[in-house]
Amino acid sequence: MSTARSTTHLVLAAEAQDLLFREARTANTFTDEPVSDEQIREIYDLVKYAPTSMNQQPLRIVLVRGAEARAALVEHMLDNNKPKTEKAPLTAILAADLNFHDHLPKVFPHAPDAKDYFADDDYRAESARFNALIQVGYFILGIRAAGLAAGPMNGFDAAGVDKEFFPEGTHSALVVVNIGKPGPDAWYPRSPRLEYDEVVTTV
């Protein structure tokens, strides 16, 4: 049931609002039900429309399925994140491609010189991470839209993950996300949210 004070101006169905926002939680435990490549493909085909500056789309996703790869990832997680990452049916490493500009001639074709805007390495890396994080938020919503739960974490050794999974040095790990159906005691009690008047000002 919707808990919104008012949804008069929202066109999305109340059930969808609840699925994506009000009733969605960060899961810490999962069932054994597998998450298929087809599910992830459908999620991506939905969330690929997230807005990014100059359509740069720097997010890259590594699906960790193999036992050896999972064990390697777990080694780089903080202790409280190790058990949930070991047991989740699927874990994804979300990273920023620091060479996203190589794709700009394809994805931003009306500006043939767009790639040149990002010649500076530091500026390009900052833009890659910023825009990839926008895509991360959309990816989490896409997981929820598929009826799954997401457990995003930034409690890990990012340098270690980069060395393990991106040894070429052109990607920067941002978030690790466990994905699946929520298991027993999957979440803590809902923490308070700031209210509208605490966040929004008009000038």
Task: Cite the ranges covered by each PLM segment.
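A glycine-rich helix N-cap at a beta->alpha junction
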Residues: 82-85, 91-96, 167-188
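C-terminal domain-closing interface element
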Residues: 182-203
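Small-aliphatic-rich amphipathic alpha-helix that forms the alpha element of a beta-alpha
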Residues: 47-48, 92, 112-164
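Residue-level signal for well-ordered alpha-helical positions
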Residues: 76, 106-107, 164
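Short, well-ordered secondary-structure micro-motifs
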Residues: 72-74, 103-105, 186-190
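Short, flexible, mixed-charge acidic loops at enzyme active sites
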Residues: 104-113
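N-terminal amphipathic, basic helical "cap/leader" segment at the start of enzyme domains
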Residues: 2-101, 200-203
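Short secondary-structure junction motifs
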Residues: 56-59, 145, 174
